[in-house]
Structure formats: C-alpha cells, structure tokens
C-alpha cells in the first residue's frame, strides 16, 4: 500500500468485455484485474523483482464489466478493484472472500476516514485503493467555466454532440438525480425512473462514453466539456491542457475503488502481498 500511495499521489490524492487472461498456475503468479488508467508498469515490475511473483494483468472499463467477467470466470482471478457499491453486491453474491488483515502490515497506515464504511463494515472484504471525485471538466479555450456551474448545464440544447460522459451507469444516473434534486444514492423507483427520463433527454448531447481512459478525449481535442475524474483533470493540466475542473453546485461525485480478493482466487497469498505492496 505504501508504494501504491507514492505512485498514485498525483491522481488520487489530488483529490467491452476483454478476453480472459491466462490464469495463474502456481504460487508464483498473480492474476490482477484493475481499472485501465490506474497502474504504472513500474509497480508491477518492482513487485515481481521483490517477491518473485509474476503478475498477469488485465483491465476493464466499468464495474459492470468486472462483475460480468467474475460471473463468467470467477475461478482464477485473484485480485480485483471494485467500487464501493459493487463491493457489497459482490460480497453478498459470494464473489469475494474475506481479507486477512493480519497479513497487511500497512493497514494501520490507512486514513481511517475511508475505513469501516457501510458497504463493507470492518473492511472484511475490501481495502481502499483510490479515493477521488468526479467533476465537470471545461476546456477554457472552448467554453467559459462560468457557464457550467451546475450538472443541469450539460442539458443545454446547443451542446449537441459535444459531451464526454463516464461509462459508468451509477455516475451518470447520479448527475441526473442531483439535477432533479434527489440523492445520488436514492433507491426510490419513481425518482430513478425520472432520472432515466432526464438521461434520455441528455443523450443527443453526448459524443462519447469513456471510463477506461477518460482524459484521452480531452487530451486529443475530441471533446472539451463533460465529466472527468479529478486525477485525470490534474494529469491533463500537467500536460498543459487548459482544463478547469468545476465542482457543480449540486456537488461532485465522490468515490472509492477498493482492492478485493475474488472467491475463486488461486493465489490468495500473492493477492495479500500486492495489496500490502
């Protein structure tokens, strides 16, 4: 966890189905499935150098993809990284196994503000990995940020075919719910139906959905307005792109992605070592 924190400081602390990989065959291999933009290859190389464990690495672009892959190939994936609400869903469906925190020397160093949350009391099944916020990204060479201080501003008809949205059902519904004045975490079916109707109105304005590398459409100039993670916005700014991240008046979308061990893991020991790395 210490080394993860060092390499993720710039992105986190600035707070499709893929074919299944070859699965681990012995205790010197770890099958690790993670979000696309999270990893630095140096970490995997360093982990292998220090532990002798080879990492078989694959990525996904949404929690739904992760869920479907584990439903299809639960046996063999060792370490995965679901978001908060999917931790509880996957736990309840028997897709995750308990984490042995006695094997995590760095657990005591974690920020207690992100521990023992309702989706996983006592962190029995998950360990916080990345904490961030999704806001409203504005390319200031293309748009005036003062015109985009609310999620509702994305519904302006003159924005047809101009927006980048996260490829994440929960996050996209969140902004529609907040536009309507509802909680982003509501379970009220009427409110969710209303949000769905709002999203249908928004769709003509959407050019692209991307959660695999959401900064890329901004970096390429394909879009200049839409949703973006704060870490991706910081990376774009570091490259000299005139991106301003606005936290709308209804609030940004806070989220936590978590290390978790699949119930079908072959190399549980290696998974613990990677979490603690």
Walk through the language-model features, giving the residues of each.
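Early extracytoplasmic/lumenal segment of secretory-pathway proteins
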Residues: 25-89
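A ligand-binding cleft/hinge motif common to bilobed small-molecule-binding domains
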Residues: 86-89, 219, 224-242
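Periplasmic-binding protein-like
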Residues: 193-201, 237-263
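A bilobed periplasmic-binding-protein/Venus flytrap-type ligand-binding module shared by bacterial periplasmic
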Residues: 135-142, 178-179, 255-270
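Sec/Tat signal peptide C-region and signal peptidase I cleavage site
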Residues: 18-24
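Extracytoplasmic ligand-binding site segments that recognize negatively charged/polar headgroups
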Residues: 81-205, 210-219
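Paired acidic/hydrophobic, glycine-rich loop segments that form the ligand-binding mouth/hinge
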Residues: 78-82, 207-208, 224-229, 244
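Bilobed periplasmic-binding protein/Venus flytrap-like ligand-binding cleft at the lobe interface
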Residues: 150-157, 257-277
